[in-house]
């Protein structure tokens, strides 16, 4: 596959659990089939939305194998495989590759707050260890530090398999710098559903979306409308979805989206600690919006 396929609508896939918190493999297969039918371009299991901090390495490999088996060659599988220990991040990436991942999403090192050179060396080691595309995940709100645009662009220029960035900094200046100065092989994706419309209008390549768990066809359509220059229809669709985008973060992700999927009959509402079920007042608000959108009756 080419690096140019790191584009379009990518779903940050939830991990369904049974009541005993084991992985619900049947539900996982159903989710993949849902995305096959909905036009999703990329499946991203084992990321933040997939509760990756609570998954052991064997579980991550099993999830990736199932997702790849179910997706076949129809949808790219780009697995979450990152941590703040560079040696461990390389190990996770290699294991994801062995399990069937065709690309990996590697979160910026968190908590230990490396320098910009530390970020560069972290991703250099990952890129040199792999023969598949690497997507940098820059999410300062969770990691506590930002990978500067200059560092991301340096990595993209130095390593052909550093293929994309999931940019979730909410920094418009940084996004514009990445879009303006990136090499030809490098894709820039937003990690914010609320920014899909303006981001794509600025020349972005796609989104890694939480809401695509619930409304994958609509997320794909929103991207397509902007790419086709149909901004009036894109605005109408975005306005229809924007409350859902907001409510998906009324509590910590992925709690709201998993509750929504349980109401839609796709998974059980089960989380692993320290995540807990939503407060009843928030459940009521989200349920009303799902009814308004026609996702449940």
UniProtKB/Swiss-Prot annotation:
This is 4-hydroxy-tetrahydrodipicolinate synthase. Homotetramer; dimer of dimers. The active site is at 137 (proton donor/acceptor), 166 (schiff-base intermediate with substrate). Pyruvate binds at residues 49, 208. It catalyses: L-aspartate 4-semialdehyde + pyruvate = (2S,4S)-4-hydroxy-2,3,4,5-tetrahydrodipicolinate + H2O + H(+). Keywords: Amino-acid biosynthesis, Cytoplasm, Diaminopimelate biosynthesis, Lyase, Lysine biosynthesis, Schiff base. Belongs to the DapA family. Catalyzes the condensation of (S)-aspartate-beta-semialdehyde [(S)-ASA] and pyruvate to 4-hydroxy-tetrahydrodipicolinate (HTPA). The gene is dapA. HAMAP family: DapA (MF_00418). NCBIfam families: dapA. One of its GO terms (molecular function) is 4-hydroxy-tetrahydrodipicolinate synthase activity. It is an enzyme of class 4 (lyase). One of its GO terms (biological process) is lysine biosynthetic process via diaminopimelate. Its EC number is 4.3.3.7. GO terms for cellular component: cytosol. InterPro entries: Aldolase_TIM, DapA, DapA-like, Schiff_base-form_aldolases_AS. Pathway: Amino-acid biosynthesis; L-lysine biosynthesis via DAP pathway; (S)-tetrahydrodipicolinate from L-aspartate: step 3/4.
């Amino acid at each position: 596959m080419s690096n140019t396929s790191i584009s379009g609508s990518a779903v940050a896939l939830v991990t369904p659990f049974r009541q005993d918190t084991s992985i619900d493999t049947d539900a996982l297969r159903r989710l993949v089939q849902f995305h096959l039918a909905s036009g999703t371009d990329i499946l991203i299991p084992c990321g933040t939305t997939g509760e990756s901090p609570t998954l052991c390495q064997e579980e991550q490999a099993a999830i990736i194998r199932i997702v790849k088996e179910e997706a076949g060659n129809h949808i790219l599988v780009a697995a979450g495989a990152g941590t703040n220990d560079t040696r461990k991040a390389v190990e996770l990436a290699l294991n994801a590759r062995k399990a069937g991942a065709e690309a990996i999403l590697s979160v910026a090192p968190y908590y230990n707050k490396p320098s910009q050179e530390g970020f560069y060396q972290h991703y250099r080691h990952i890129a040199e260890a792999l023969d598949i595309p690497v997507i940098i995940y820059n999410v300062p709100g969770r990691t506590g530090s930002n990978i500067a645009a200059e560092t991301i662009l340096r990595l993209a220029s130095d390593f052909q398999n550093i293929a994309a960035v999931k940019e979730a900094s909410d920094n418009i200046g940084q996004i514009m710098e990445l879009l303006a100065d990136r090499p030809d092989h490098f894709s820039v994706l937003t990690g914010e559903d609320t920014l899909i419309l303006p981001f794509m209008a600025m020349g972005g390549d796609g989104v890694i979306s939480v809401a695509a768990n619930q409304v994958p066809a609509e997320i794909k359509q929103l991207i397509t409308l902007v790419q086709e220059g149909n901004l009036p229809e894109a605005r109408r669709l975005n306005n229809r979805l924007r409350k859902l985008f907001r409510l998906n973060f009324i509590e910590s992700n992925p709690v709201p989206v998993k509750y929504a999927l349980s109401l839609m009959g796709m998974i059980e509402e089960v989380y692993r600690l320290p995540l807990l079920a939503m407060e009843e007042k928030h459940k009521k608000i989200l349920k009303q919006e799902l009814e308004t959108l026609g996702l449940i009756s």
